Amino acid sequence: QLTFTPGW
């Protein structure tokens, strides 16, 4: 599962 990560 891909989750939004600030900085990625």
From Swiss-Prot:
The organism's place on the tree of life at top rank: Eukaryota
GO molecular function: hormone activity
Alphabetical list of InterPro entries matching this protein: Adipokinetic_hormone_CS (IPR002047)
Signal sequence annotation: none
Cellular component, GO annotation: extracellular region
Keywords in alphabetical order: Amidation, Flight, Hormone, Neuropeptide, Pyrrolidone carboxylic acid, Secreted
Disulfide cross-links: none
Localization, UniProt: Secreted
GO biological process, one term: flight behavior
Tryptophan amide: residues carrying this PTM: W8
Modification type Pyrrolidone carboxylic acid: residues: Q1
rRNA-binding in keyword set: no
Keyword Cell inner membrane found: no
Function, in words: This hormone, released from cells in the corpora cardiaca, causes release of diglycerides from the fat body and stimulation of muscles to use these diglycerides as an energy source during energy-demanding processes.
Family under the similarity heading: Belongs to the AKH/HRTH/RPCH family.
Protein name: Adipokinetic hormone
